[in-house]
């Protein structure tokens, strides 16, 4: 039986800093609340990443001032290799992280962010399995981007010529893959937590066992009772 290639799970995260995280939630929440929401999301994603089997290495790639972290986040990040994001835009930062992990011997690299704290862990497992037969896998998000990208070899094409943060990220990426004849697999869609209505949706449809830290926080926020 053929042995599976070594696999790495990468979490992309911004260090929790007041006024710099989850700013679009500011329509409804204070800066302190936005910070608390982000920290809860980060905790949930770290627990998610720790729970998915099949990975030989787990990494946390930080942006921002990660030198000083809240104690609970510092503790939760201990099982991960802590690294720094490098690059002028998100595409270059993801490419550089993948390049680093492939150089260290990984044969499959999966990258997730912190915007989908209730993502079912099996989605990440599906991505890992898909990379046994295709060079690239994407998890589409409802806002036109993607919540996950994975690759079984280093490539630049998916990370160039994309307007990051726009609603055209996924469509442009698929166009690039087709133009360059790069095979890929699409996972089932999911949603990001970017705006207040996304939090209301999550609170109303919380799947059992998902996003426990965020669920606990939302139950304490008076704004949800208004």
What is the meaning of each model-derived region?
Residues 1-25:
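N-terminal nucleotide-binding beta1-loop-alpha1 segment
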């Amino acid at each position: 039986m053929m042995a599976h290639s070594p696999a790495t799970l990468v979490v992309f995260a911004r260090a929790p800093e007041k006024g710099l995280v989850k700013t679009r939630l500011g329509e409804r929440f204070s800066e302190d609340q936005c910070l608390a929401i982000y920290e809860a999301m980060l905790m949930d994603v770290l627990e998610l990443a720790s729970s998915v089997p099949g990975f030989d290495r787990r990494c946390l790639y930080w942006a921002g001032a990660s030198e000083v972290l809240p104690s609970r986040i510092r503790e939760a990040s201990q099982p991960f290799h802590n690294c720094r994001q490098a690059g002028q835009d998100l595409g270059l930062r993801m490419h550089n992280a993948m390049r680093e992990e492939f150089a260290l011997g990984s044969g499959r690299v999966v990258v997730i962010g912190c915007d989908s704290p209730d993502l079912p862990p099996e989605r990440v497992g599906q991505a890992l399995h898909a990379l046994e037969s295709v060079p690239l896998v994407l998890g589409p998000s409802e806002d036109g981007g993607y919540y996950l990208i994975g690759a079984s070899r280093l490539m630049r094409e998916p990370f160039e010529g994309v307007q990051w943060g726009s609603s055209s990220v996924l469509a442009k990426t698929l166009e690039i893959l087709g133009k360059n004849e790069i095979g890929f697999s699409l996972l089932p869609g999911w949603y990001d937590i970017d705006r207040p209505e996304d939090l209301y949706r999550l609170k109303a449809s919380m799947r059992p066992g998902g996003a426990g830290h965020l669920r606990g926080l939302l139950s304490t926020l008076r704004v949800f009772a208004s």
